[in-house]
Amino acid sequence: MSLDINQIALHQLIKRDEQNLELVLRDSLLEPTTTVVEMVAELHRVYSAKNKAYGLFNEESELAQALRLQRQGEEDFLAFSRAATGRLRDELAKYPFADGGIVLFCHYRYLAVEYLLVTVLNNLSSMRVNENLDINPTHYLDINHADIVARIDLTEWETNPQSTRYLTFLKGRVGRKVADFFMDFLGASEGLNAKAQNRGLLQAVDDFTAEAQLDKAERQNVRQQVYSYCNEQLQAGEEIELESLSKELSGVSEVSFSEFTAEKGYELEESFPADRSTLRQLTKYAGSGGGLTINFDAMLLGERIFWDPATDTLTIKGTPPNLHDQLQRRTSGGK
């Protein structure tokens, strides 16, 4: 992985009681040792694989102002990180669920793009077996389950300040909402809505195939083409390029897909991030609620699965063998 650390700082917030978060600040930056580089590379990998929300700094953002001064050389990175951790502590202290953790600021470069990663990591206890096969206690940073994370694309921020997507963040778990304190700390608001872009794409694809008067099999083939392209982009860490997708769909209609979306006013960006959960709807129908979970391939609708919108009834012809066996055992009294 072509990742180079410019500067990295580590601090800690310790919850002493329900009212107080103690601030523990390092007096020096971390050295970019092999272990540190491997840790940041793992953070980068884990974060890049997750669905993210996009945002931008508010005009009054204290973090943005401090970061701008640091980038201009008026403040060093350590001082910037120490002051920012203090502001984070002040925001966290407003919420009863604040647990503290290891606060990390890392300025790094990956594939010619500069980033600032800010995260709060849990330092967890576990066990390990040593070379003598004895079991000893150990501690580790819970990188895989980090949910308080934000990353600023410094290159995008400085070259295109009008962008609505240079800042990305994770929304967090229920009951631990990033928007409640981390966005206040960042002084940021949501920008590009990736889910809305993906939903708009799905609607445009359906309308495009309908206008082209394709039959059911042809429509499903187009949806599969779109899914394959988008999934490849997602796996490669690339965005959906509308023009590239349009070329993939050449031949479907006399009008190109990109021309169709522009003429019909779908307001799709030229490129936008793929959203995994939304894109699944191209090839599958899925839903859950009231103790019921249903998931099936889109091609089965109208063949083995039928929906009556008047009665909101779903009829399934031919159940999966394992489900059939369970139902048969239950209805026969377990015999």
From Swiss-Prot:
Q: Which Pfam families match?
A: NA37
GO CC aspect terms: bacterial nucleoid; cytoplasm
Q: Where in the cell is it found?
A: Cytoplasm, Nucleoid
TM annotation in the entry? none
Is the keyword Transmembrane helix in the record? Answer: no
The molecular function terms in GO held by this entry are:
double-stranded DNA binding; single-stranded RNA binding
Q: Which UniProt keywords apply?
A: Cytoplasm
The region annotated as signal peptide is none
Family membership = Belongs to the YejK family.
Against HAMAP family, the record matches this protein to: NdpA (MF_00730)
Q: NCBIfam families in the record, alphabetically?
A: PRK00378.1
Q: What is the protein name given in its UniProt record?
A: Nucleoid-associated protein YejK
Native species: Salmonella paratyphi C (strain RKS4594)
Gene encoding this chain? yejK
